[in-house]
Amino acid sequence: MVSTISRQDQNNNDDLNQPSKEGRFGKYGGQYVPETLMPALFELEEAASDAWKDKQFVNELNHLLKTYVGRETPLYEAKRLTEHYQTKTSTSRIWLKREDLNHTGAHKINNALGQALLAIRMGKQRIIAETGAGQHGVATATVCARFGLQCIIYMGAEDIKRQSLNVFRMKLLGAEVKVVTSGTATLKDATSEAIRDWVSNVETTHYILGSVAGPHPFPMIVRDFHAVIGEEAKKQCLESFGSLPDILLACVGGGSNAMGLFHPFVKEKSVRLIGVEAAGSGVNTEKHAATITKGSVGILHGSMSLLLQDKDGQVQEAHSISAGLDYPGVGPEHSYLKDIGRAEYGSVTDAEALDALKLVSELEGIIPALETAHAFAWLEKLCPTLDKDTEIVINCSGRGDKDVNTVASSLNID
């Protein structure tokens, strides 16, 4: 089965699956940006709309997803993990959607490739991006190298310490990595600096935003490029066990990997959608990144969504052992799905994520990224509550090579 994606296939559903013409998911989303960026956002929305109607664009994207990215990614039955979580009342069969096997090691390449093709279509030769864990930065640097585009990556100084391997990879791929020292020197601050760059260079530059956050049309565009994950998973589930899955499980920071898996299933009401946030040191402390669990409505990086903020509306610092989840906001569509009760969201601590990473590594021979480990950790809470045999699909959104130093230090492994 060859992986193909088509905007028409994804978006011929009702309002549950797409924003309004104003870029709203219910009350969330919108365009809270300087006036100088509005023409670029309109241009991007028009370019994306036209591109999805262009067979040549869609065919080129699908060809590169197959021959360059390595899609489709397997749906793998994790038999030892399934056995580990078997209870007296149910056997929860666990399947992994192996986005970690993509070129560059994570789901991020799906969106980076698609947006690079849009940038070329718009005549933009300079690309900027933000990154936390480094995977989006690596993916963006990779596609820029592939197409001969100038590439500038903004990354917080704190994340650079945690993700030195990915920093080297970006530089090796020809990207300029700009260190961000303002604020907490993490993903939020890198995003702010990237937006400042875009405001100053909007005529020549395209900003490849890495998550389903930011001003419209970014949440929609990023979601649509990642929806290939869920489209493949839906077909693979039918082939593997003859039905749709009972539960989809994914980690959530900004929320792109989760939305890519969830989106094609949103109208399938029999399928539970569960997103797992980073509880850090605990949601009752000040050191966490559980935006949906503990946040309130506010505006960040051009979009209205749930945020971690104080009573005066000031954005608070987020904390997670995972650089990719260390963000005080979340994509507006996730906030909407939570409000209407279509998706459920929980959180796990740093310690729980580390335990899950170790468990999956030992039982399946797969070292997941720290971000992904948060989704695996939710199995400890989920499986004991199930009273029947259940098919669970986890989005294995990235591999853990980038995290080995952090994990070794945290687990005291020499």
Curated annotation (Swiss-Prot):
Record has RNA-binding as a keyword: no
InterPro entries to which the protein is assigned, alphabetical: Trp_synth_b_CS (IPR006653), Trp_synth_beta (IPR006654), Trp_synth_beta/beta-like (IPR023026), TrpB-like_PALP (IPR001926), TrpB-like_PALP_sf (IPR036052)
Enzyme Commission numbers on file: 4.2.1.20
Pathway membership, UniProt: Amino-acid biosynthesis; L-tryptophan biosynthesis; L-tryptophan from chorismate: step 5/5
Disulfide partners: none
Class in the EC hierarchy, top level: lyase
Keyword vocabulary terms for this entry: Amino-acid biosynthesis, Aromatic amino acid biosynthesis, Lyase, Pyridoxal phosphate, Tryptophan biosynthesis
Transmembrane segments: none
Domain of life according to the entry: Bacteria
Residue span of region Disordered: 1-28
Modified residues (N6-(pyridoxal phosphate)lysine): 108
Entry function: The beta subunit is responsible for the synthesis of L-tryptophan from indole and L-serine.
Assembly and binders: Tetramer of two alpha and two beta chains.
Name of the protein this chain belongs to: Tryptophan synthase beta chain
Source organism of the structure: Prochlorococcus marinus subsp. pastoris (strain CCMP1986 / NIES-2087 / MED4)
